[in-house]
Structure formats: structure tokens, C-alpha cells
Amino acid sequence: MRSHLVKPGSVYDGIEPGELGETTESVQDRVRQLESRNSFLEEQCSQIESEKRYLENQKIKYEREIRKLQSELDRMKTSPLIIGTVIDVIKNDRIIVRSSNGPQFLVNVSQYIDEKKLLPGAKVALNQHTLAIAEVIPSTEEPFVAAMEVIESVEVDYDQIGGLDEQIQELQEAVELPLTSPERFARIGIEPPKGVLLYGLPGTGKTLLAKAVAHRTNATFIRVVGSELVQKYIGDGSKLVREIFEMARKKAPSIIFIDELDSIAARRLNETTGADREVQRTLMQLLAEMDGFDKRKNIRIIAATNRPDVLDPAILRPGRFDRLVHVPMPGIEARGKILKIHCEKMTLAEDIDFKKLAKATEGMSGADLKAIATEAGMFAVRRDKELVEMEEFLEAVEKVSMAADTQKMMPSNLPETMFV
């Protein structure tokens, strides 16, 4: 029986009611499947788009890396430039330069270079083929020279130096006052000393005095050991001397301290080897730099040596080292002061007699007295004591005395012709 709802001739004509319900459910199920499939495809499409963007970013990154590596490769393939020095500046962008090989050339200048930087003495880079000036090399301090400048404050003051009051006064007058109160010298009408030479036996406090000057002054303090100026290749020692004094001029007021001066300023002899001639070149450069000072330059020189007898007479004349300060071995009162200074931070017993210790240390230097204080403390540590007593100091005096006697005996027992 046909349903009264189905019109004759319609699309549902001839379909039973049960069959019509099944068809609707299958269509709805198919729609749900298609919607689910569509959602899945949309998610896949979104994921693919995300991967596409990531790959495009990676492509840009790798292309940038390729360009960077290609640029580095091209730079590595570029011909090196020759280092030269400007000798003279001529009109019409023409410069006379000396190459690193020695000969001089008249060359052109790139239009992109500031002509104000092209001064005689300036370092420039030259094209390998045309020798045209490609760039001006900025002046830099030699790292070896820059390391000689004392940056950190030295914790040594004059009150920590015993028995050298006269030497401290002479050092203050010759080094500190010209830098801190130059008007005093101008008022009297004299030029302050340009250099001070400290000489004396080892361990008497020469380097300690220089450290105290570094602590008391706000000037740039440049410390040089004489042996550092002795270089392997010809001209390197003279170059170091020039650069040290150039740094002192740039950072004035400044103090140059040359320790172990005898290593480069020994007396010049007629018979010399190649190494001796190089040391003499360094000495002559040092003499020239010291003569180049004038009263307008706030630069002072302190030197120390324990062999004044071997120094060249040229370096001892007035105008170079105007003041020679002898640092003697400490006397009995000075030894007592030095021992008290070195024992300030030590935990001492009440029976310590510094006068007795000063008498027992006859002929000892300040360095020996410091060693005595250290050894006395070591004896107390060994015995697990709370205080350092007189007993430890007497044992320390005996130990340091034996070491000093052994050291004195060693060179005297060697034959004079041993190293000939």
C-alpha cells in the first residue's frame, strides 16, 4: 500500500517507507564521513602550510649562510696588502711611502681615505700590485708594552718602609713634587730632576721604594725590567723603548720604573758580539729618549740596580739621572723598625725584644728581615702555638743567617777561569 504522503510521479514514488528511512540514514552517515574527511584534510593542509613556512625560513637561513661563507671565501682569496709608512705628503693626492721591504715609492691615494690621517709616520696598507694606499692603519699600543702599565693600586706606602727616611725624602723631592707641585720649582727658577737612580745591595728596598711611589702618586706608573728590553731580532729592543716612552707621553703625568738597569746599560766595550751590539742599540735609544724630555713633559724616570760599577758613564751624567740615591744596608735602629713593620699583623708574645733581634741581625738586609719574620711564624705553626715567641725568632735568625752564609760562599769558591 502506498503512503498517502507520497505523490504520484515524485522521486519517492515506488519506494517503500522502510526503504526511504534507510536511504536518509545512509546519506547522513555519508555527510558525516565527508565532514570528518574535510576536517582531516583541513588539518593536513594547515600542517603542510606550517611546514612550508618552516622550510622557507630554513631556505632563507641557509642562503644567508651561503652568502656569508662565500664572502669569507672571497675575502680569504683576496691578495694581502703590504704594510708601509708615510714619509712625505705631496699635492695632488700623491704620497711618498716606505714599504716594509725598505724602498720608497711615490703612490696614489684612494679617494675614500681621509687626507687628514695621512701624516708622516702613519702606518698604511698598500695594494700589492699598484702600491696605492688602500687604508690607514690605526696606531695601537704593543700588547707587551701595554702590559707594563701598573693598573692596580700597589699596597705599599712609605710608612711600611723602615730606616730609609733620607732616601724617601730625596725620592719625594725628585719624583712626586715635580708632578704634584710644579709651581714650587717654577717659583725658584730651576728644573726638577728628570731621573733618579736607586743603587744598593740586593734586598735593601729599592723596588719597595718604587712601589711606594706608585701608591702615593696618581700618575701612570710603567714598570719595566731591563732584561725585557733585550730582544732577539735587531731593532726590536729599540722599538720597545720608543713605544714605552710614547705611551708615557700619551698618559702623562707618568713615571717609568726600570728595574735591573745594568742588564741594558752596562759599560760599552770595543770588542763586542752581535748580541752585545743589539744591547748597545737599545741603550742608545734609551739615552736618546731620556735626552728628548723637556720641562713641559710630566714624565719622570726611576731606575734601580745593584751593580752601579758596571753602568755606562753616559747614562749617569746630569740630565739623564740627575739624582743618584744610595740605598744602604739597614743599621741597628732601621733593622728594629723593619722587623716591627713585618710583624704588625703577627700574633706575638709579650717577650719579643726587637732591640735584641736588631743586634742579632747585623749585616742583614730588609729582605732577610722579612724572611726572619716569616720563618718565625712557620716555627710557631709547626708547633701549633697560639703566639709567636722569642724562641721562634731566635731560631729564625739562625736559619736565615746560615742560608745567607751559604749563598755568600757559593760564588767565592768558584774558580775565576771557570766561565772563560
UniProtKB/Swiss-Prot annotation:
Entry-linked Gene3D superfamilies: 1.10.8.60, Nucleic acid-binding proteins (2.40.50.140), P-loop containing nucleotide triphosphate hydrolases (3.40.50.300)
GO molecular function, one term: ATP hydrolysis activity
Protein function: ATPase which is responsible for recognizing, binding, unfolding and translocation of substrate proteins into the archaeal 20S proteasome core particle. Is essential for opening the gate of the 20S proteasome via an interaction with its C-terminus, thereby allowing substrate entry and access to the site of proteolysis. Thus, the C-termini of the proteasomal ATPase function like a 'key in a lock' to induce gate opening and therefore regulate proteolysis.
Keyword field contains Transcription regulation: no
Gene that this sequence comes from: pan
Quaternary structure annotation from Swiss-Prot or TrEMBL: Homohexamer. The hexameric complex has a two-ring architecture resembling a top hat that caps the 20S proteasome core at one or both ends. Upon ATP-binding, the C-terminus of PAN interacts with the alpha-rings of the proteasome core by binding to the intersubunit pockets.
Residues that hold ATP according to the record: 203-208, 342
Similarity comment: Belongs to the AAA ATPase family.
Source species of the chain: Methanosarcina mazei (strain ATCC BAA-159 / DSM 3647 / Goe1 / Go1 / JCM 11833 / OCM 88) (Methanosarcina frisia)
Region of interest called Docks into pockets in the proteasome alpha-ring to cause gate opening, as start-end residue ranges on this chain: 418-420
Entry comment, domain topic: Consists of three main regions, an N-terminal coiled-coil domain that may assist in substrate recognition, an interdomain involved in PAN hexamerization, and a C-terminal ATPase domain of the AAA type.
Protein name in the entry: Proteasome-activating nucleotidase
Region ranges (Disordered): 1-25
Family matches, as InterPro entries: 26S_Proteasome_ATPase (IPR050221), AAA+_ATPase (IPR003593), AAA_lid_3 (IPR041569), ATPase_AAA_core (IPR003959), ATPase_AAA_CS (IPR003960), NA-bd_OB-fold (IPR012340), Nucleotidase_PAN (IPR023501), P-loop_NTPase (IPR027417)
